[in-house]
Amino acid sequence: MKNPLLRPWLTEKSTKLTEQKGQYVFQVKIDADKFDIKKAVEEKFGVDVVSIRTINCLGKSKRQYTRKGLIAGKKSDWKKAIVTLGDGQTIDYYAKPAEKSEK
């Protein structure tokens, strides 16, 4: 699978996990498995991954009342991965990735 990581998930709870336990949270593709996520994090950030927990989040159902009646819809389902790193390792979300040298 080509890069299952979509974006870092930055919330108060995920920031607290990062500061206290060294765990980082990412939004990943819905069909990504733990092996793909581990490989992508290790390659992109150059760290050792100790463990990964994944959570399937269901999209919310939405309703809108209009003159023509009720319009029902649903937001997309998505997946979240909590990645635990080795001791003393960190990830800088805002650093630019290392540039690849051209051949």
UniProtKB/Swiss-Prot annotation:
One cellular component (GO) term of this entry: ribonucleoprotein complex
Keyword Acetylation: no
InterPro entries, A to Z: Nucleotide-bd_a/b_plait_sf, Ribosomal_uL23-like, Ribosomal_uL23/eL15/eS24_sf
MF terms in GO: rRNA binding; structural constituent of ribosome
Record key words, sorted: Ribonucleoprotein, Ribosomal protein, RNA-binding, rRNA-binding
Gene Ontology BP annotations: translation
Highest taxon of the lineage: Bacteria
A Pfam family per the record: Ribosomal_L23
Ribonucleoprotein found in the keyword field: yes
Function (record text): One of the early assembly proteins it binds 23S rRNA. One of the proteins that surrounds the polypeptide exit tunnel on the outside of the ribosome. Forms the main docking site for trigger factor binding to the ribosome.
Recorded family membership: Belongs to the universal ribosomal protein uL23 family.
Family annotation (NCBIfam families): PRK05738.2-4
Quaternary organization: Part of the 50S ribosomal subunit. Contacts protein L29, and trigger factor when it is bound to the ribosome.
Protein name: Large ribosomal subunit protein uL23
Species this chain originates from: Chlorobaculum tepidum (strain ATCC 49652 / DSM 12025 / NBRC 103806 / TLS) (Chlorobium tepidum)
